[in-house]
Amino acid sequence: MRTALTAFVGTTLALGLTAPATAEPSGGTAPSLPAFVPHPSDWSPNYTVFPYNLWQVRVTPEQVDAQRESCQWFNAQYGTLMSQIVGFQNFLGGQHDYWTAPGVQAAGDAVKANVDQSAAFLDPRAHTLYITNYPDQSQYSPLYNGDSIYHLWYQLTQISDKIAKQQPSGVINANIATANVYGNVIRDSGVCNGA
């Protein structure tokens, strides 16, 4: 009974925390995402939420640009990237996590290339948004959900690492689920609307 309950809870968590799109990779490989190029816009950060309204004086123009550009990437490519990641995870799981099965390595390489490209774009922006507070040395973002962008970037690096190490689909799922949580926070907060 205990084993059955544990399996049920684990399955429920795995199903409930993955990204919504689950299509298998077309032809076994994901198409390359175009290199994202940010553009000027009238977007501005949300300073109405406490404590970000108090931290507004700490925000630099570089942080505003970093969040605007991260949001533009999010609006343009996050959904497609997560669909590819989940599609690959399901494809790998359907092959019983055998990386030597036909098409698995090529599909993993294609998705990893897109994840790496996205993480490379977000890396300097995420680090600009997530700063160290003095004197207590805690880390935070003075912009609303800037920390979520940082955590999303980190999860993408971990997904790439797990694909590079040919981990089983269930191991990759932990980072996919966490990336999906941060993606939902960003999307549902509306912080990127109009970027």
Predicted regions and their residues:
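Secretory targeting and sorting signals
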Residues: 1-25
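Low-complexity, intrinsically disordered/propeptide-like segments
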Residues: 8, 16-20, 36, 53, ...
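N-terminal low-complexity, Pro/Thr/Ser-rich intrinsically disordered segments
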Residues: 25-70
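Alpha-helical segments in soluble extracytoplasmic regions
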Residues: 62-141, 171-194
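Membrane-inserting hydrophobic helices used for pore formation or membrane fusion
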Residues: 144-159
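Polar/charged, Q/E/K-enriched amphipathic alpha-helical segments with strong coiled-coil propensity
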Residues: 157, 161-179
